[in-house]
Structures are given as C-alpha cells and as structure tokens.
Amino acid sequence: MKAKFHEYLTRFRKQKGYTQAQMAEQIGVFRSTYTNYESGNRTPDYEVLERICDVLDCSLDELFGRTPKYVTNCNVIREETTPYHVTARQEEKPRLAIGVQNFRDLREKHAYYVDKTQFIEEFLDSWYQVTLITRPRRFGKTLNMSMLAEFLDCTKDSADIFAGTKVFAGSQWQEMNRHPVVFLSFLNVKADSAGALIQALKDTVRAEYERYYTLFGDERLPEFQRKEFQMAYESLHAGSERKDSESYVIRSIMILCQTLNLYYGKKVYLLLDEYDTPFMSANSGEYYEEVRSILNGILSTSLKGNPFLEKAVLTGIQRIAKENIFSGLNNLIVCTVQEKEYDDCFGFTEKEVRELLAYCNVEFSDELKKMYDGYRFGDTEVYNPWSVSCYAARQKLESYWVNTSENSILRNALEVQGDSFKKEYETLIQEGAVEAVVDFSMAYYERMDEAALWGLLVNAGIVTIEEAIEEDYYRLKIPNLEVWKVFKELTACHLRIDERQMEKMLTALKRGNMERFAEEYQRILMELPSCHDLKDENSYHMMMLGMCAFLRRDYEVKSNRESGLGRSDICLYAKHDRYPNLILEFKYTKDEKEDLSELAGEAIRQIREKQYDAEMKGKVHYVGLAHCGKKTCVSWE
C-alpha cells in the first residue's frame, strides 16, 4: 500500500501544480519530511493524511488508489463524502518532547523548542581550535551537540529544521551544511568490564564510519586512503583478529578525519559528547589501567597533531588532566561552570522558563523557583531544564533529576575523605552553604583531595557557586530543594544510617507522632556500625542536625541559637500551620546506671525554664533526648 500511496501522492500534487516545498508548507511539515513521503521512505500519520486530502481536494480512498477512476481526473466533484475525510482544522500546538536528544527528531516532531542556537554562533566565532565545556548531566549537552552537528554537516540539508531560530538570522548562517563532521557521543560508552567498555567504544566509532560507508569504494579517494579506511573499519568490529587492531582503533577517529578531508577538500569539525563517561566508568569499575592506553590514545590522536582538524568541541562533567589529552594544545579553552563562555547555552534562563510554562498554560510560582532554580553558570542564573520540562508536562512539583553515576562516586568519596572535608560537608548540610577551596583543573579520581571533590560537586550540579571570594576559593551553596533530595541520600551514607529509616523518623517528628519518632530514633542508633563516634552530647546533636537539614522545605532549622534565656540545641520553626514548631534538647551520660528517662525529663525542664520557645508562634512540641552509647530515651510535651 505504501508503494501505491507515494506514487498517487506525487501524481496528485503535480496535477494540482504544487511544488514539494509548497505542499510541505500547506500541510505543516518540513520539506525534507514531505520529500520522504513521495520517495516512499516515510508514511504520514493519520492527521497529516487528513491535511493532505484537504490540500489536494481528494479522499483517502483516492489517495491510496482505491477508486482509480478519480485518479485521472482530479477536478471531478466527489460523489460522496468518505468517512476518512474531515474539514480543515486548526493545527495543534507543538507538544513537549521529553527526553528527545536528537535535534532533527525534535524539530521534525514539531515539538516545543527552547532556542539555544546561539551556541552555534558563539562556537563558530571563537578563536579556539579545541573547546571543552563541562556541565551537569541533563542540562542539554547532547541536544546542543546534535544541533551543532546538524548545522555544520555537509551531508545534511538542514534549512528546514533551523527555520525561525536565532542562528537563521545570524552572521554564521552561510556556514550551514558546508563542512564534514565527525559526531560521536560517548554517553553509553560505559560497562562493568574492560572488554565490554572497549567494545562499546568501538561500536560508537564504527557507527560514524558507517555513515560514510559509500566512501569505501569511491575512486575519488586515493587507493591507499580507501585501504586505510577499510582496515580501521574492520578493526572496530567485535572479535577483530588483526594484529594491528588496537593501533587502528586508537587512530580510528583521526583516520576518519583524514578520509573526509581528502574526499571533501575541507578540514573536519570533531564533536565529542560526554567524552569523560568511559573514564569515569572505568574508574568506578576498577579496571582503568586495562583501558587507559586506548582511551588516552584515541582522544590524543584526534586532538593533538591531527592536521585534518578544523575545530573540535568536547562536552562532559569534568576536565581530565593527567592523561595528557589536552596537554600541548596551545589553542584550548576549558569552559567550566564558573566561566562566562556559553553561560546561557545550557540550562533554562528564567525568561525561557516563564515562556515555556506560559505556552503550557502552567503558572510560574515561587515554589517552582525554589525547587528547580539556583544554578549559576558564569554570570547567568539558570534552572534545571530537565526538571522544568517534566514539571511543565506533568504539573507536579516533584524531584525529576537523578544523577546516579555521580552519586556513587560521591558516596565513595565521603567514605575516604578526612575530618576537614567532613566538617565542611556538615556546615553545608546544616547551613545550606559553605566556603571552600575548589579545584576545577582535573577530575576527582585523578587527585582524590577535598578541593577536587568540591570541583566534582560543582561540575555535577550538586552544589553551585554563590560567590567567588578569591582565586580557587568560593562560597558554595545547595542550589535548590530538588538537590536536597540527593543530599539526603548522601548524608544518610555519611552518617551510616538507612535513608528510609531517616525519612520515617523525620516524618513522624514533623507530624507530632512522638512515640513513632522515639522508636525510629532508637532503631537508627542501634543499627549504627559503631558507637565510638557518639562520645558526647554534641555528637548526637550534630547527627540529628544533619538529618533535620532535610526538613528545610517545611521548617526553618536553627542550631545553638540564642532564644529566650539561653541557647537551644535545635529549634525547628514551622513554615506551615499544619506542622508544629519543635525544640530538641540533648543530654548525655557515660554512666550506664543513670536513669535516662530522668535525664530526658531534665532536658524538657530546661526548654521550659529557659523559654526557648519565646519567638515561636503556634503549637510547640518540646523534645528531650537522653543518651548513653546506643541507648536513648525520648520525652516530650
């Protein structure tokens, strides 16, 4: 049926005197999409078929050749209305396409698009030959790289998908589809073993080779180059038995650049998305030394001493320094999150968020801002684009951003860091901000000190820069409420407690269910790996304060603050009437014979006598917590 359809479609269009471009415009699709309809490579959906029938003044039966007598006379008046044909209707608004990372797919779906094509102009206007951009996961890196590839690639016809964008009216428009491009995404080059990771790397590069498969036998290429191209391609297959296979894999990207340079007579643009994923996977899988030579070699040969390279851009989470990938590159710029370059190209600005929400008939609110805003790239304040898009689609203020791969690294890092980092981390959790030395110059796994770890936390989007105090010294903050969820998991790991038990305990506390709170608190203490860290009253105080930090959405958390006639341990000021205010006072004894219930009662009396609730309005719960090792008693009123 498809074969008949595309023949009849072409015939009807020509009899009506329309060009393909005119047809595409009238039915609301890209010209390239319509061309695929007539070539038989694509079939329109039902709604598009209806629009085609309206434009060509025919029925679906006629369009599919089910009533041949009409085909030769398109001016005949229809004798009856077919059940398929409907009158023309207003075209639906573009929908959100959540998770689509291919620019062409996004545009051909007529999906809503937050225009980031200024990235193309800024990149092409740059003087640097190699650009490295570090940004968190799900901040639009892959989509932007796909967009750049579509714009530059001389094998594409991209005018339709860039129509109406910023770059369409810019100074670099004439560069569209004028250059050979090698575009590789290492997003999925990760595995549990060295062999599996190397094969994933080969598969990714081989797929780009296959895009240019017709060059294998093209006589416009010198024979030696065709042979070189073929041998590199064969080496990228699983189970290659060539003795020089590894050498060809290491040089495979450069060989592809060389081939394209000879064929098209122009130097190549190299785009490497998520370049650091295989390095991070190999390190977390503890097989890095097995793959080091290939990972280092394939990137080094592509970027250094590659005479066929016009410009390259790489994106990832962090800069890898020790492997010498970037050493010796005199024309390199590294754009971390504190740099001004490309600061508005990744993530949504508030203006873009408001426009998106208005388009979706969703109201902008302070609650949304607190949940998803708070990042700072260069001089630009940005929102998490993934979370905002999900919220616009679902209209539920939830946590959508999951950063699993980085979280595993951070959990391991918390285990090995010393007291200095732990104190800074506790300050961050308790106050929401901390001042620290930050190192952006290399990946954390290359130098596992606290400055490099803070650099990873910033680049991964777990914390953001609030203020640059001096060189390498910053005030950092947790960007928003959504990221507090990540810290809840990390803090549970840091305190060596179960996250779900912590959640149960905190829920019971804010609901005023003190019996349940006491049970969960005792359970947490009993399941701690050791009681050696619980050596005084302050130890319990700090542990509880770290957990109470995750009540910030509903409470203002204060510790050791002057109130009434003294300093309270922890005061929780309710932000909503539905929750009670809470005052927690801690007591400790080494004497196992001392009555803990009496000690907890003493804490309650202290709260009352010192009038710690003097500034609180509404319902207040007093909570006294007495401890001896892992044993506790909780009193309340």
Question: Which positions does each model-derived feature cover?
Answer:
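Short, charged recognition helix plus adjacent turn
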Residues: 64-88
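Amphipathic alpha-helical segments of the small helical/lid subdomains adjacent to P-loop NTPase cores
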Residues: 321-329, 335-391, 424-429
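A short, Lys/Arg-rich alpha-helix, primarily the initiator
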Residues: 1-15
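P-loop NTPase motor core
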Residues: 99, 115, 153, 157-215
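DNA major-groove recognition helix of helix-turn-helix/homeodomain DNA-binding modules
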Residues: 45-62
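Extended alpha-helical interface modules used as scaffolds for assembling large macromolecular complexes
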Residues: 332-333, 383, 388-613, 632-637
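Substrate-engagement module of ASCE P-loop NTPases
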Residues: 209, 252-261, 290-310, 612
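Short alpha-helical DNA-recognition segment
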Residues: 17-39, 51
